[in-house]
């Protein structure tokens, strides 16, 4: 009887050991990963070069919370949950968890921006800095009615970051926009970038540096001709014809317009 019990215990113990070996717990997995040596990774990357780039992209932000970026920088290359920071010393993506600037920042949603677009005819003075960027060019105004994305991006940025200046232009019979951030030191919150990306389907949106300013450029690549979004463009044009552009704004427009020729 005793022998039988001992055999049962031993077989049960072997069974449990077998299960543990087949399914290592979290601590064992972690221990296994820590045993990987640099030459092991090097051997893997030699066989699969594409994994090296993925590995580097994964580890950069968690280690320092920051990753350097090159300009021009397309928002299509933006890492989720990171802010963008520009200065004369460095241009970086910063992990939201490591960001010290965004706690009190309120960013409009893409839906807020669309509502504002639909109401822009009745809120011309409220949105006057947007309309200054058209320099009373009625053809550009007409084009803007078919491209709500332009207004939405301006609205999101303008309500998040102060001291910006839009300049509208035509490229390939589509409306484009430069937003000039009038400082070389700039922090763009993660949520602001997220909302811009949410509305910019069919557009190329990128950041660059011109002299002492950071420039956000919006270029339309694919125009949505099936949009059901309409505004009273005739009434809008009439109001803009009557709107005065301050001399200071006109001078600034001419200054930036000269610098931005050929920039896009």
From Swiss-Prot:
The keyword Phosphoprotein applies. Pfam families: Herpes_UL31 (PF02718). One of its GO terms (molecular function) is zinc ion binding. Its main location: host cell. InterPro entries: Herpes_UL31 (IPR021152). Residues 1-12 have a biased composition (Basic residues). It is found in: Host nucleus inner membrane. Residues 1-22 are annotated as: Disordered. GO terms for cellular component: host cell nuclear inner membrane; membrane. Keywords: Host membrane, Host nucleus, Membrane, Metal-binding, Phosphoprotein, Zinc, Zinc-finger. GO terms for biological process: viral budding from nuclear membrane. Phosphorylated at serine residues in the N-terminus. This phosphorylation regulates the localization within the inner nuclear membrane. Signal peptide: none annotated. A zinc finger (CCCH-type) spans 83-187. Plays an essential role in virion nuclear egress, the first step of virion release from infected cell. Within the host nucleus, NEC1 interacts with the newly formed capsid through the vertexes and directs it to the inner nuclear membrane by associating with NEC2. Induces the budding of the capsid at the inner nuclear membrane as well as its envelopment into the perinuclear space. Forms a heterohexameric complex with NEC2. Interacts with capsid vertex specific component 2/CVC2; this interaction directs the capsid to the host inner nuclear membrane to initiate budding. Belongs to the herpesviridae NEC1 protein family. This is Nuclear egress protein 1. It comes from Human herpesvirus 6B (strain Z29). The lineage of its organism: Viruses, Duplodnaviria, Heunggongvirae, Peploviricota, Herviviricetes.
């Amino acid at each position: 009887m005793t022998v039988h019990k001992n055999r049962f215990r031993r077989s049960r113990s072997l069974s449990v050991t077998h299960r543990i070996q087949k399914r290592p717990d979290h601590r064992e997995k972690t221990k296994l990963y820590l045993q990987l040596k640099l030459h092991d990774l090097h051997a893997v990357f030699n066989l699969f070069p594409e994994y090296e780039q993925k590995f580097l992209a994964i580890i950069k932000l968690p280690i320092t919370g920051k990753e350097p970026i090159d300009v021009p920088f397309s928002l299509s290359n933006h890492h989720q949950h990171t802010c963008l920071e520009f200065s004369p010393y460095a241009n970086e993506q910063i992990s939201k968890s490591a960001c010290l600037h965004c706690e009190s920042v309120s960013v409009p949603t893409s839906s807020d921006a669309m509502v504002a677009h639909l109401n822009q005819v009745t809120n011309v003075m409220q949105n006057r800095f947007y309309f200054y960027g058209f320099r009373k060019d009625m053809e550009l105004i007409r084009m803007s009615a078919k491209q709500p994305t332009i207004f939405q991006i301006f609205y999101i940025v303008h309500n998040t970051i102060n001291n910006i200046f839009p300049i509208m232009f035509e490229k390939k019979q589509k409306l484009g926009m430069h937003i000039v951030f009038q400082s070389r030191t700039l922090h763009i919150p993660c949520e602001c970038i997220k909302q811009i990306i949410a509305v910019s389907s069919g557009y190329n949106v990128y950041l660059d540096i011109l002299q002492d300013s950071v420039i956000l450029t919006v270029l339309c690549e694919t125009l949505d001709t099936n949009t059901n979004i309409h505004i009273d463009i005739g009434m809008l044009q009439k109001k803009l014809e009557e709107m005065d552009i301050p001399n200071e704004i006109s001078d600034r427009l001419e200054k930036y317009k000269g610098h931005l020729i050929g920039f896009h």
